[in-house]
UniProtKB/Swiss-Prot annotation:
The lineage of its organism: Bacteria, Pseudomonadati, Pseudomonadota, Betaproteobacteria, Burkholderiales. It comes from Bordetella pertussis (strain Tohama I / ATCC BAA-589 / NCTC 13251). Its main location: cytoplasm. It holds the Pfam family RRF. This is Ribosome-recycling factor. NCBIfam families: frr. It is found in: Cytoplasm. The gene is frr.
């Protein structure tokens, strides 16, 4: 494995850590409605679980209401049940062919709890990025030990990996601050 391969691998895996964080932050509810909140809710469709977005049209009605319109009328009941049983704390209301999902306002205490969850997710992502840095540095040390690269090349490569790590940690911090601001906005 070359220095370029190690750097590329670290960069790719750090980007995946950022994507994972972004996906987990998207699931955390803020006071405002957004269609992405239902992305991970699965509904039984002919015996197999599928995301709601594959069996229904999901739209925003206003800042606090999501409208779910099933492609098949028979799916209204199972979709409503899946939303109600999800861990999102939502209470869907069936209106004939359409299901309305009002977003309850977050209490101050719930907002604080959610910001703690956001910080925890961010810390987990930072730990993952730092572990990737450590793995890359260990791979570089192995190259030096096997006399494939010089110590100067190792130092330069470690500096590159450190820059990637710093950039990833900075991006994580920005995501956390942004999500906390969304949650705390009343």
């Amino acid at each position: 494995m070359s220095v370029a391969d190690i750097r590329k691998s670290a960069e790719t895996r750090m980007a995946k850590s950022l994507e994972t964080l972004k996906a987990s932050l998207a699931k955390i509810r803020t006071g405002r409605a957004h269609t992405g909140i239902l992305d991970h809710v699965q509904v039984e469709y002919y015996g197999s679980p599928v995301p709601i977005s594959q069996v229904a049209n999901v739209n925003l009605v206003d800042a606090r209401t999501i409208s779910v319109q099933p492609y098949e009328k028979s799916m209204a009941g199972p979709i409503e049940k899946a939303i109600r049983e999800s861990d999102l704390g939502l209470n869907p209301v069936s209106m004939g062919e359409t299901i309305r999902v009002p977003m309850p306002a977050l209490t101050e205490e719930r907002r604080r709890d959610l910001t703690k969850v956001v910080k925890s997710e961010g810390e987990d992502a930072k730990v993952a990025v730092r572990n990737l840095r450590r793995e890359a540095n260990e791979a570089l040390k192995k190259l030096v030990k096997d006399k494939e690269i010089s110590e100067d090349d190792e130092r330069r490569a470690q500096d590159d990996v450190q820059k990637l790590t710093d950039r990833a940690v900075g991006d994580i911090d920005k995501m956390i601050v942004q999500k906390e601001a969304e949650i705390m906005t009343v």
